[in-house]
A protein has these predicted regions:
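Hydrophobic alpha-helical bundle cores within soluble ligand-binding/oligomerization subdomains
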Residues: 2-297
Length: 297
């Protein structure tokens, strides 16, 4: 039986097998051009590969002049609304915008006051993990990577859902809203678990507060004393809004298209998307930014 401590070891036998894999796993790069095979989601001319159609969001970062791509100031639209107009709207009324924009992206129209309040209440009601989930799933095998922790937790949520395989619009909407509510909990709890077990930090698990906005709730869960300023919450809220959607052609969204097209359940599709987002050429690139700043220090 293999010793657990050597689980990650690269043995001489594995090195030999890897050599064979390299020798017999090569394809002539010229064949990709010959047969017009797209290597990833970027074409040879630098444009994104058209992989589908969406009216959920749109992003423009260049214009075409005489067949040349000319960079321009970026423009981001959610359901036809300029992101600047959306932000101006909720900032002018001193509101948090994440919930409002989530409603817009999900349902295609901006909510009125009552619809927004109902949606916020629904998000708050779903802000609760199953009994012993934190202890059994998050605490017992803390991951050093938040995307890994999220993907594993999302897959496990399947076991708690009596309608996990129901792909009707009504059920997928329910599952989606629940996951939106639970992602902050899972992410922060996993972060605290890792810091506790691997870095020796104190373990602090705050109970959820359904009355807080998503941005406020994240900061409350993250801070040992649960305290944050309004400016911090508003800045985080703005960051969440800007990162919600960007055109539908990115790697993790494409992964969701591919996986969900088989008719699989919501949890499997989202876990696959999180696996894509974890990669260093996608969302995982943010980790390199942190490492760069650490190196500068």
């Amino acid at each position: 039986m293999q010793n657990y401590n050597s689980y990650s070891e690269i043995t001489p036998e594995l090195l030999a097998l890897s050599k064979l894999s390299r020798e017999h796993g090569q394809i002539d790069p010229a064949l990709y051009t010959k047969y017009e095979v797209k290597r990833g989601l970027r074409d040879l001319n630098g444009k994104g590969v058209l992989a589908g159609l969406t009216d959920i969001s749109e992003i423009t970062s260049y214009i075409i002049e005489d067949s040349d791509m000319i960079p321009c100031d970026g423009r981001l639209y959610y359901r036809g609304y300029k992101i600047q107009d959306l932000v101006t709207g909720f900032e002018k009324e001193n509101r948090y915008g994440f919930e409002e924009v989530a409603y817009l992206l999900l349902f295609g129209q901006l909510p009125d006051k009552q619809a927004l309040e109902n949606f916020q209440q629904l998000l708050g009601e779903y802000r609760s993990l199953p009994t012993h989930f934190v202890r059994d799933i998050i605490m017992k095998a803390p991951s050093k990577d938040m995307m890994n922790a999220l993907a594993r937790s999302v897959l496990t949520m399947y076991a708690y859902d009596d309608r996990a395989d129901d792909t009707s619009i009504e059920n997928v909407v329910r599952q989606s809203i629940q996951l939106i509510s639970l992602f902050p909990l899972i992410s922060v709890y996993a972060y605290h678990a890792y810091n506790h077990y691997h870095d020796g930090a104190s373990l602090i698990i705050h109970p959820p507060k359904p009355e807080l906005s998503t941005a406020e709730h994240l900061l409350y869960l993250l801070r040992p004393d649960g305290q944050y300023t309004e400016l911090e919450a508003k800045m985080l809220d703005l960051g969440l809004v800007l990162h919600m959607e960007h055109g539908g052609g990115n790697n993790s969204t494409f992964t969701t298209h591919v996986v969900s097209s088989s008719g699989t359940d919501t949890y499997s599709a989202i876990a696959a998307a999180l696996g894509s987002l974890k990669g260093p050429k996608h969302g995982g690139a943010n980790v390199k930014v942190v490492k760069m700043f650490d190196d500068l220090k």
